[in-house]
């Protein structure tokens, strides 16, 4: 069996670095042919390029000459001779890398800038292992229209869990999807208690080690709202049949309830290497991709309802998805700007979602969903959010 040829977008981020771990653990199954990253860590992507022997490397920003020198130095240190991958530099670098011939493109980019690479990957016919939920959320029908049935394989742990659970029944037998949420670092706090939380507290996630934006979104439950939209689009299940339940241990990653009342759950210790491996190998499983639950150790799994008063983001995301058009794009863009303002000390934590709600209330949508209308809506949302933040007081 020939190893699957893999392209990794966002290789220096959390998803990308763990994907390389997965490839290292199963070299007979996977072979990295290309990498891309933002360019903030040239030394790391140079090391990754040499380590994986990638044929092409892309960075959104940075100096091509400097990267080439770093690759040469890393190759010399590793004793690798005659290694000179093709290098792409510029805002479209990840899109060009995504179009390289391969079997699987893993999109681990953070944010809606992943939309163009997602569409490029789908255009090649390769399987898209999608960790960049924002591209599906803001692209919506555009992404679905570009994808062949089964071409998109989710990498988010919740959606990977649902995909596995759905193997237990037919589409007609599905009653509802149940996404689990850890509750984040502020679980159990009232809205009033959230007013004065700090950026440092928001980044102290109890389970996952992620980047600044995703970790903050997890604290506000915006991330779970985005995941509800993603589940709706991926699995064609109506929004009113998608529930969220808080599960602090993050062992049960999601569940599917069937029409006969049975519920199938996927459980494993929190480790993103498992859904990454499944995304790269789908529909096959990768042996020993991650540790299994240790049933010899005493443990308890608890579940509790989501406090939608303290954390209104999930309901707000559902409302945006129901309106469709460019509303999800506005939801995402406004949130990104508000999160940056929070970390800059300009607004309170609770003002993040309040600002998003306010901007959404002013949006009228687009008559036609195109890449251009999505980009225009995002531009409008970012500008409107910044206007509102300029008049916001702590």
Swiss-Prot record:
List of residues binding NADPH: 12-15, 38, 41, 132, 134, 211
Pathway: Isoprenoid biosynthesis; isopentenyl diphosphate biosynthesis via DXP pathway; isopentenyl diphosphate from 1-deoxy-D-xylulose 5-phosphate: step 1/6
List of residues binding 1-deoxy-D-xylulose 5-phosphate: 133, 157-158, 182, 205, 218, 223-224, 227
Molecular-function annotations in GO: 1-deoxy-D-xylulose-5-phosphate reductoisomerase activity; manganese ion binding; NADPH binding
Binding site for Mn(2+): 156, 158, 227
The EC number(s) this enzyme carries: 1.1.1.267
EC class of the enzyme, as a word: oxidoreductase
Coiled-coil regions listed: none
Protein's name in the database: 1-deoxy-D-xylulose 5-phosphate reductoisomerase
Organism: Paenarthrobacter aurescens (strain TC1)
Phylogenetic classification of the source organism: Bacteria, Bacillati, Actinomycetota, Actinomycetes, Micrococcales
């Amino acid at each position: 069996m020939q190893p699957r040829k893999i392209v990794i977008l966002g290789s220096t981020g959390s998803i990308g670095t763990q994907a390389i771990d997965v490839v290292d653990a199963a070299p007979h199954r996977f072979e990295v042919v290309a990498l891309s990253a933002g360019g903030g860590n040239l030394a790391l992507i140079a090391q990754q390029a040499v380590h994986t022997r990638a044929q092409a490397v892309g960075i959104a920003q940075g100096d091509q000459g400097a990267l080439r020198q770093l690759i040469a130095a890393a190759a010399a240190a590793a004793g690798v001779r005659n290694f000179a991958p093709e290098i792409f530099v510029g805002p479209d670098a990840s899109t060009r890398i995504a179009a390289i011939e391969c079997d699987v493109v893993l999109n681990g980019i953070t944010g809606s800038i992943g939309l163009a690479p997602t569409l490029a990957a789908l255009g090649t016919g390769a399987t898209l292992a999608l960790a960049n939920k924002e591209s599906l959320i803001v692209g919506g029908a555009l992404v679905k229209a570009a994808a062949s049935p089964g071409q998109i394989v989710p990498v988010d742990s919740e959606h990977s869990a649902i995909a596995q659970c759905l193997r237990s029944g037919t589409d007609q037998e599905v009653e509802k999807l149940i996404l689990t949420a850890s509750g984040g670092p502020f679980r159990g706090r009232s809205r009033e208690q959230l007013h004065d939380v700090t950026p440092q507290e928001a980044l102290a996630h109890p389970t996952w080690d992620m980047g600044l934006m995703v970790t903050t979104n997890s604290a506000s439950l915006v991330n779970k709202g985005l995941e509800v939209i993603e589940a709706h689009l991926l699995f064609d299940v109506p929004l009113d049949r998608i529930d969220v339940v808080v599960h602090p241990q993050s062992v049960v990653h999601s569940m599917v309830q069937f029409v006969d009342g049975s519920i199938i759950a996927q459980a494993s210790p929190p480790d993103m290497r498992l859904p990454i491996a499944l995304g790269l190998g789908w529909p096959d499983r990768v042996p020993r991709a991650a540790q299994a639950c240790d049933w010899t150790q005493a443990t308890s799994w608890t579940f509790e309802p989501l406090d939608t008063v303290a954390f209104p983001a999930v309901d707000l995301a559902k409302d945006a998805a129901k309106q469709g058009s460019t509303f999800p794009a506005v939801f995402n863009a406004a949130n990104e700007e508000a999160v940056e303002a929070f970390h800059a000390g300009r607004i309170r934590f609770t003002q993040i979602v309040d600002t998003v709600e306010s901007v959404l209330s002013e949006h009228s949508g687009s008559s036609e969903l195109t890449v251009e209308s999505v980009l225009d809506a995002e531009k409008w949302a970012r500008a409107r959010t910044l206007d509102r933040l300029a008049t916001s007081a702590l």
